[in-house]
Amino acid sequence: MAETHHQVTGPEEAPKPTPLFEAAVLISLALAVLALFLFAWLGNEVLQGDTQHFDLTVRSWIHGFASPGMTRAMTAISLLGYNILIAELLIAFAFFAWLRWRRAAVWLAVAMAGALALDMTLKYAYHRTRPTAYFGAAPHSYSFPSGHALCSFCFYGVLAGLLSARTKSLAWRLVIWIVAAVLVIAIGLSRIYLGVHYPSDVIAGYLAAAVWVGTVIVLDHVRKVRSSRRIAG
């Protein structure tokens, strides 16, 4: 327990904002705006059918790595992106409760509720039919954007943002973000490998999630700054 508190802050407490951290928040906001424009552009390309060559080429290339062992691994990785998110959320909430990070738990809940709503809304807006799955039957929902890519990005991205903002060690902040990035990328690749999404679906999921994650991180930072000012005043 003592070791944990050397790495993370106490209940509802965050490290004092530094120029580096302030810059990171501004970068998050800028990336969210950029992701919004890129998603709009990609969505239009999909509706026009202009991503077909790219999608088929990448799908074929990734499928070239198929093997029984790889399929088992990718199936397991894919579960982390959607199917067992409820269990992962409960673990995260329990961790936040242990550290008495009530507001962090609220932000994570808001982020995931928004992610699910965003996924359903965008799928029905674009009505893209799924590709033929390589292993088993494809899900019955629409294909664009990838819900696994969107939800995993939101969950691990917001979780990394909340943890790193409340972690004192710069080294641990880097570790948190690296682990989150590896998980998100692996989950996206697993959906392409299994054949249940086009590559453009996965990219779109990442872009949509980046908009939402950037928004949540900025709002969390604004809340902490206002709280600090009230305490100081």
What are these regions (language model features)?
Residues 2-85, 125-136:
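N-terminal transmembrane-helix/juxtamembrane module of multi-pass inner/ER membrane proteins
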Residues 10, 15, 135-233:
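Membrane-embedded catalytic cores of phosphoryl/pyrophosphoryl-handling enzymes
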Residues 21-25, 29, 104-108, 173-180, ...:
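Residue-level signature of transmembrane alpha-helical entry/exit and packing/kink sites
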Residues 39, 43, 70, 118, ...:
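Alpha-helical membrane-inserting segments
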Residues 40-41, 120-130, 186-197:
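C-terminal ends of transmembrane alpha-helices
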Residues 53-56, 88-89, 95-170, 174-178:
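Membrane-interface loops
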Residues 83, 87-92, 229:
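Membrane-helix interface/capping segments
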